[in-house]
Amino acid sequence: ALDADQRKRFQLAERLAEVADAVMGIVLHAEAIHDASHWRQLGEKVLVENADGRKRTGRTTVELAAVLDGLPDARVCLDLANVYQVDPTMLEMRRMLKAFAGRVGQVHLSQLDHACAHRPLMLGIVHELRQVARLVPDTMVILESCVDELSIASQVRLAKLCFQPLDASGTTTWSYPLPAGL
């Protein structure tokens, strides 16, 4: 018999199954998947997102693999800000890309503040994200920056910079136009 929490999760999975055909994917945090059997019916519609350091699981390749083992058809949602928050060297992201090659279905792009809230992309983080973002070509990207309407265009430009190719030496050689008056 299911306890109340398990019953709620099962009911959520059932409700999401009803709309699965109408959507490209359903992103779930790893810690929301206590019983993979509830979610297995959704197959490749499930995208399991890596977590930031506040979460109990899904922060590392090993933790994410434990969840994905129970969901053989699920894809991975790589949140670059989350992995950067967990490991600023981005080595963990490279481990994730190696372990889950071919399963990455979506990339989330943003910057986190100290409280792990989504913030606008800044030029400094773009350089760091660019080292990894280029390894997931032809993947849907969700820009998670929380900005006002006037800042959307600049956030899109910064997001595009994350996916520009590196030069022959493997370094970044690009410039970002500064606003007039600076």
Language-model segments: residues:
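Short, catalytically relevant binding-site loops at active-site mouths
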Residues: 33-35, 52-55, 82-85
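Structural motif
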Residues: 1, 28-33, 50-52, 144-147
